[in-house]
Curated annotation (Swiss-Prot):
Family: Belongs to the PsaM family.
GO biological process: photosynthesis
Keyword Flavoprotein in record: no
Gene from which this protein is expressed: psaM
NCBIfam families according to UniProt: PS_I_psaM
Lineage, opening ranks: Bacteria, Bacillati, Cyanobacteriota, Cyanophyceae, Synechococcales
Protein name (record): Photosystem I reaction center subunit XII
Transmembrane segments: 10-32
Length: 34
């Protein structure tokens, strides 16, 4: 890796990515069932 990230930045990035994935899944499921 070219840039060295701190553990807190990596943790925040993982949390944001997880929330985005969960929101996308819930949205697709709700659209699929309607």
């Amino acid at each position: 890796m070219a840039t060295v990230l701190s553990q807190s930045e990596i943790y925040i990035a993982l949390v944001v990515a997880a929330h985005a994935a969960i929101l996308a899944l819930r949205l697709s499921v709700s659209l699929y069932r309607s």
